C-alpha cells in the first residue's frame, strides 16, 4: 500500500471516529440543566443519573449556567449530535421556547422538569405543585406569626414558572390571613442576592415579623442578614428542602422549608423519557410530592 492510500485510509478512519463520538447513541438521554451552581438542581441531576444507570441509559448533562443563550446553544449542540430525546430544566419559562421549538423542528421529543415552557411542544412536564407549596408556606407563617403578620417575600428569577407559581400560592395565603406584605422583591434564587436584598429591605422595614423566600438559597441569605442585624426573632420559611435548608431547620435557624424531592423529579424525567423512546403513552403532567419540614 502506498503512502497516499494509507493517508486516505487513516483520514477516513479518523473521520468515522469523530462522527461516532459526536453522534448520540440510541441508548442516550440528554439533560439540559438551568444551573449546576444550585444544590437543588445537582440533586435533580443525581436522581436522573441514578435512574439512567438503573434503566441502562447513558445520560449526557449540559449546564446552561442560568443563561438562556447558553441554553439555546446547548440544545443546538444536541440537535446536531442527533439526540433522540431531550429533558430540559428551563432557565426561563418564556425564553426556553426558542430551544423547545428548535428541538421540535428536529423531531426531538421534549420533556420539561421543574419549570414549564410557555412556547413550543412538550410531551410531558414533571414538577412539584409549586402553587400548593407557596400556600403551605404562607399558612405556616400564619400559624406561627399570626393573622395580619408583617411579611417580606423574596422572589425567584422573574419569568420562571416556579417563581410565578410559588408567588401565586403565597398570595392565596396572604389574602386568607390578611398579611401586611411590606415588600416583594426578586433575589433570583441566589444566596448572596438574598443576603443583599434582605439587608436593604431591613433598613426600610425593621418591623418585619416573617420572611418567605421562594427557595432555600435565598432563605439562607436572608437568615444571615437577619442574624447580622440582631433580628433572630424574625421567622424565615424557605422552599426546596435542600440539604443546607433542612440542616438549618434542624438547627433551629430556619423556621421551615417546603421540601421538594428534586431527585425524584430527575428520576421521573428519565422514566418518562424511557417510555417515550419505547413508543408508550405518557401523561401531559406528572406531579411530585411536597412536604413541610419543621424542627421536630
UniProtKB/Swiss-Prot annotation:
The complex is composed of an ATP-binding protein (RbsA), two transmembrane proteins (RbsC) and a solute-binding protein (RbsB). This is Ribose import binding protein RbsB. The gene is rbsB. NCBIfam families: PRK10653.1. Part of the ABC transporter complex RbsABC involved in ribose import. Binds ribose. It is found in: Periplasm. Residues 1-25 form the signal peptide. Its main location: periplasm.
Amino acid at each position: 500500500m502506498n503512502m497516499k492510500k494509507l493517508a486516505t485510509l487513516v483520514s477516513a478512519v479518523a473521520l468515522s471516529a469523530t462522527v461516532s463520538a459526536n453522534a448520540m447513541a440510541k441508548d442516550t438521554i440528554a439533560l439540559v440543566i438551568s444551573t449546576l451552581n444550585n444544590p437543588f438542581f445537582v440533586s435533580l441531576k443525581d436522581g436522573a443519573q441514578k435512574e439512567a444507570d438503573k434503566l441502562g441509559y447513558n445520560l449526557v448533562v449540559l449546564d446552561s449556567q442560568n443563561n438562556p443563550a447558553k441554553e439555546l446553544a446547548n440544545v443546538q449542540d444536541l440537535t446536531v449530535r442527533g439526540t433522540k430525546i431531550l429533558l430540559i430544566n428551563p432557565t426561563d419559562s418564556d425564553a426556553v421556547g426558542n430551544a423547545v421549538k428548535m428541538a421540535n423542528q428536529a423531531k426531538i421529543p421534549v420533556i420539561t422538569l421543574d419549570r414549564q415552557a410557555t412556547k413550543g411542544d412538550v410531551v410531558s412536564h414533571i414538577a412539584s405543585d409549586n402553587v400548593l407549596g407557596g400556600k403551605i408556606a404562607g399558612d405556616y407563617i400564619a400559624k406561627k406569626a399570626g393573622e395580619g403578620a408583617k411579611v417580606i417575600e423574596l422572589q425567584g428569577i422573574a419569568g420562571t414558572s416556579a417563581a410565578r407559581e410559588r408567588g401565586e400560592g403565597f398570595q392565596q395565603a396572604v389574602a386568607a390571613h390578611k398579611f401586611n406584605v411590606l415588600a416583594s422583591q426578586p433575589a433570583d434564587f441566589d444566596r448572596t442576592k438574598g443576603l443583599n436584598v434582605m439587608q436593604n429591605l431591613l433598613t426600610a422595614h425593621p418591623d418585619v415579623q416573617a420572611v418567605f423566600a421562594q427557595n432555600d438559597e435565598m432563605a439562607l441569605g436572608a437568615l444571615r442578614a437577619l442574624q447580622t442585624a440582631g433580628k433572630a426573632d424574625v421567622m424565615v420559611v424557605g422552599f426546596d428542602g435542600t440539604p443546607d435548608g433542612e440542616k438549618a431547620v434542624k438547627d433551629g435557624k430556619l423556621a421551615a422549608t417546603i421540601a421538594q424531592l428534586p431527585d425524584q423529579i430527575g428520576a421521573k424525567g428519565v422514566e418518562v423519557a424511557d417510555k417515550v423512546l419505547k413508543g408508550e403513552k405518557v401523561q401531559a403532567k406528572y406531579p411530585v410530592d411536597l412536604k413541610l419540614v419543621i424542627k421536630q
